[in-house]
A protein has these predicted regions:
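Juxtamembrane membrane-water interface segments that cap and precede transmembrane helices
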Residues: 29, 139-140, 319-348, 392
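Hydrophobic/aromatic-rich transmembrane helices and adjacent perimembrane loops
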Residues: 41-44, 194, 201, 253-254, ...
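Membrane-interface helix-loop-helix junctions at transmembrane boundaries of multi-pass membrane enzymes
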Residues: 61-63, 223-230, 270-284, 359-386
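Active-site lumenal/periplasmic loops and adjacent helix-entry segments of GT-C-fold
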Residues: 61-64, 71, 79-207, 410, ...
């Protein structure tokens, strides 16, 4: 009897989990083939993704699964796709943001301080939750920072999926619709890699989803209610608001904006007498809790870090849009890096994949209109979904692409709601089996296209070294140089080098990479000027640069992301030829500069004599 109940509860979930496991094996085989540049790497990888996503989505679309099975399927989908990200680099962190957070966590383990300055990511000093949790787990368990980070983000991914499922279920009243909503949410361009990386946004999304679920529970408590439920829910809302405020700035601001929208729509409906929500508490307490918590944290702790990061992101996006509209600059080449272009089929798929999302939004809005919906939360989520076309427009500019990418995980909450709404209350009739097959195929196309849209072709899978290609520029030579620095150079020595090497030296190497300018001299000039003169020596002295590190491979081709060191360096996004090897090796003959390390590709020069 127990066995039959368990089988009824889990349904097809164990079998689909086994199929997802087979998909992960294909992904791993594809990545291994990609590391050796073998043919068949991409077909194996994409077949693995399809084997994970399509069968689970097909089952979620059907009406035969029970609530428990749907929860299991949602968790299986979310965690299987998380493992896809882990398989991209299963031995260490290699992404830029991840290495910045590794540095922050390592400092927390060594010093016990959560607010140490971080040259790779200054925001870590203002939002220390991820570093604190990971450092605590590492110290208590004896696990490395890498493995502790994987566990923390894996748990966050599970919480995100479960909380969103419960949120959508409570809004629509349908477990079936909620499950489909999660499958649609997985189609946002950030879901597979960006929001699965070891970074504060990955953790914050889980906290935000739990907070919104608690806010929904509070909003539906009647004004006349008293007792432990009211006090407990209020305490939970407050605790989650505080937790979110100290975890991530953009997620906190997005939640503040959403709750303000929800509250405004509720107020309008109540004043018109068009809503029955008057007897419920509504979202006022959650809105005040997150606004006050983030406001205080911003004012007393993280204001500088928030303005530095978000101010730069939004100002660059705004300037890019103005330049595009005024003709000062051309539009960005879609679905490519500065020196990378995707195949025509991939570009076509990425473009076509946005069509089902637009159709879904239109269909969902039509349902809301026909039902004369007067629920303020549903209307607020619909408004969020309407921001999706706006984010697509931002991708026409170089800087706007970053803003669009970061907004997708928030906008897709509204899209997921509309998908859940469309499936809620539906009965399987007529040719629904054929319709399920067709919808699964469309969902798979959308999922694949979103990944093409959100991730550079070069970084979807591992492979041979490429210049200025984020993950693909991290190689054993760079890691060896970082290990040498950690073992033999003074900790936190000031060093100048390219972006990838700076990331490795600043994390695993324990150095302090320096960016920016000295007076009127751009620091990348030290690396890329044809010769070494008074200006370069002055910059080294003024910035107290103890070491300059040169990767000779930079002379092989232009950087894929458009720049070698910083996005505002001279020639950024406009280079058509690589920097000459002679330019990179000019420090060999500079008096007072000595070569102290070389592994054939990466050379470390001691420039401390020039700082005296």
């Amino acid at each position: 009897m127990i066995r039959s109940r368990g089988q009824a509860l889990l349904g097809a979930m164990p079998a689909l989990a086994l199929i997802a496991g087979a998909g992960l094996i294909l992904v791993a085989l594809g990545n291994n083939a990609a590391r050796e540049a073998h043919a068949g790497a991409q077909p194996l990888f994409w077949a693995g993704l399809a084997l994970i996503y399509a069968p689970i989505t097909f089952r979620l679309l059907g009406g035969g699964a029970g609530r428990g099975e749907r929860i299991g399927l949602v968790l299986t989908l979310a965690l299987s796709l998380y493992v896809v990200k882990v398989l991209r680099s299963p031995a260490e962190f290699v992404r830029f943001d991840e290495l910045g957070w590794w540095r922050a966590t390592h400092e927390a383990v060594l010093t016990g301080s959560l607010f140490e300055s971080n040259p790779l990511n200054p925001a870590t000093a203002g939002f220390p939750s991820l570093a604190a949790i990971t450092a605590a787990l590492s110290q208590l368990s004896g696990l490395s920072i890498f493995h502790s980070g994987l566990i923390v983000i894996g748990l966050a991914r599970a919480v995100l999926a479960l909380a969103l499922f419960l949120l959508l279920e409570r809004i629509t009243g349908s477990a079936r619709g909620a499950g489909v909503g999660i499958a649609v949410y997985a189609c946002n361009p950030s879901f597979l890699y960006f929001d699965a990386q070891f970074g504060y946004e990955s953790l914050a999304l889980a906290v935000a989803a739990a907070f919104l679920l608690a806010a929904l529970r509070w909003s539906r408590i009647e004004w006349t209610a008293v007792g432990p439920e009211v006090a407990g829910t209020a305490a939970l809302v407050t605790a989650l608001a505080c937790g979110l405020a100290v975890t991530h700035h953009m997620t906190s601001l997005a939640v503040v904006g959403f709750l303000a929208l929800w509250l405004a729509l509720r107020t309008i409906l109540l004043r018109r007498g068009e809503s029955e929500e008057v007897r419920f508490k509504g979202p006022l307490l959650p809105a005040l809790a997150i606004a006050i918590a983030f406001g205080l944290w911003f004012a007393f702790v993280a204001g500088g870090e928030t303005l530095h990061e978000l101010g730069g992101v939004f100002s660059r996006a705004f300037n890019s849009i103005v330049d595009l509209l005024t003709g000062s600059s051309g539009s960005k080449r879609l679905f490519s890096g500065a020196s990378e272009s995707q195949p025509l089929a991939a570009r076509a798929l990425a473009i076509v994949s946005v069509v089902p999302v637009l159709v879904l939004i239109g269909a969902g809005l039509r349902v809301l209109w026909r039902r004369r919906t007067r629920d303020s939360l549903s209307l607020a989520l619909a408004v969020v979904a309407l921001l999706y076309p706006v984010t697509l427009g931002l991708r026409l500019t170089q800087a706007g692409s970053e803003t669009s990418q970061r907004a997708s995980e928030f906008v897709f909450l509204g899209v997921a709601f509309l998908a859940a709404l469309l499936l809620s209350g539906r009965t399987d009739r007529g040719r629904w089996l054929l319709a399920r097959i067709g919808l699964t195929a469309v969902a798979l196309l959308t999922f694949a296209g979103a990944f093409l849209l959100g991730e550079l072709q070069a970084t979807r899978q591992p492979g041979p070294y490429l210049v200025g290609a984020e993950d693909r520029s991290v190689t054993p030579q760079g890691l060896a140089a970082a290990r040498f620095a950690a073992a033999h150079l003074p900790p936190r020595s000031r060093v100048l080098t390219d972006r990838t090497t700076a990331t490795l030296l600043g994390s695993y190497g324990g150095m302090d990479p320096i960016f920016g300018r000295y007076a009127d001299i751009a620091l990348p000039r030290i690396l890329f000027a044809p010769g070494f003169g008074h200006a370069e020596e002055r910059a080294i002295h003024g910035q107290s640069l103890s070491f300059v590190v040169v990767d000779r491979r930079l002379g092989g081709e232009p950087p894929l992301i458009g720049y070698y060191v910083e996005s505002d360096e001279s020639g950024a996004f406009a280079r058509r030829r690589a920097i000459g090897l002679g330019v990179l090796e000019k420090l060999r003959s500079v008096p007072g500069v000595s070569k102290i390390y070389s592994n054939g590709q990466i050379v470390i020069y001691d420039t401390s004599e020039l700082t005296r």
